[in-house]
């Protein structure tokens, strides 16, 4: 059987972009990619500007925003529901973990502080966030007292937090995990829990149950701080850290450049090799900003910046299209 393939395209960039950074976040709304947060120097937030990239003109600009503008932060996440972006948590310049939830209305360019009290997730950074058409999901991360393994949902219609059942002991608290919504279920993939992890867990909101799933095939090696998105019945992952630095977050660990796909129905992993027309592979990196997106009618993974094996922050922009026809997508 021929190997599965994927196509990398390096996107042209014009205008006033975010520059080199890691531990930041992006989200796609319509034909614009929004970027927020991150660091150029380890643990030092760059700024709190909201950068927007028009995919039709390949041009960056700084959004002219109003409202409750979030302070600078690293280890932040964001996800979009409709035309609204939600930003949660992170770590500020004083290395304080944060727990505010902000929304940004892309139709009015207005920030709103949605939640900052005790009714939502505890303060954290380097957690993971994803969304469906009604909820923003927050999982794990680095909390004040250690790594976390809780799953929260923010209902954007009811405007309230929902704390989901706590998973079993097998799902250890972790930072930098993959998180994806696939066919109504929430999947937690890998992450760092003192060591790099290689386990996969699934939460069914309808039954409020957690299951650790056993996968097979070309299983990726244990990793964290990788890029992960859900497309159809698949979870696509790219890159990440496979061996942490002795300097912790101040240094660069060993990164990988591999891409894999997990079929959530068969629970089989397959590696995605570079296909014809794939150019400018991003190479090994982690701590990137990423989002699922659709460009030129193709579903795939948007990837901006990140940290390199030399501990240099990156400022390039890629789109990865997995060629999933061979497995029924």
Task: Identify what each model region corresponds to.
Residues 1-329:
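Kelch-like beta-propeller repeat domains
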């Amino acid at each position: 059987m021929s190997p599965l393939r994927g196509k990398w395209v390096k996107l042209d960039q014009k205008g006033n972009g975010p520059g080199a950074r890691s531990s930041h976040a992006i989200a796609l709304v319509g034909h614009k990619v929004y970027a927020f947060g991150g660091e150029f120097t380890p643990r030092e937030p760059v700024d709190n500007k909201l950068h927007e990239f028009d995919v039709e003109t390949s041009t960056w600009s700084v959004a002219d925003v109003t409202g409750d503008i979030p302070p600078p932060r690293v280890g932040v996440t964001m996800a979009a529901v409709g035309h609204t972006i939600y930003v949660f948590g992170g770590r500020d310049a004083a290395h304080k973990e944060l727990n505010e939830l902000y929304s940004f209305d892309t139709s009015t360019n207005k920030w709103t502080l949605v939640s900052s009290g005790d009714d939502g997730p505890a303060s954290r950074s380097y957690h993971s966030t994803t969304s469906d058409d009604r909820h923003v999901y927050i999982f794990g991360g680095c909390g004040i007292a250690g790594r976390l393994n809780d799953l929260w949902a923010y209902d954007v219609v009811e405007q309230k937090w929902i704390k989901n059942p706590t998973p079993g002991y097998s799902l250890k608290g972790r930072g930098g995990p993959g998180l994806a919504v696939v066919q109504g279920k929430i999947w937690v993939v890998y992450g760092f829990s003192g060591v790099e992890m290689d386990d996969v867990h699934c939460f069914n909101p309808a039954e409020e149950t957690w299951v650790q799933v056993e996968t097979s095939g070309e299983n990726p090696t244990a990793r964290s701080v990788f890029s992960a998105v859900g497309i159809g019945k698949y979870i696509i992952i790219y890159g990440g850290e496979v061996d942490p630095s002795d300097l912790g977050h101040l240094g660069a660990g060993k990164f990988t450049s591999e891409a894999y796909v997990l079929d959530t129905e068969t629970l089989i992993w397959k590696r995605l090799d570079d296909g014809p027309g794939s150019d400018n592979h991003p190479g090994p990196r982690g701590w990137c900003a990423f989002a699922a997106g659709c460009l030129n009618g193709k579903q795939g993974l948007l990837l901006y910046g990140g940290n390199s094996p030399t501990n240099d922050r990156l400022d390039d922009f890629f789109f990865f299209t997995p060629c999933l026809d061979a497995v029924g997508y």
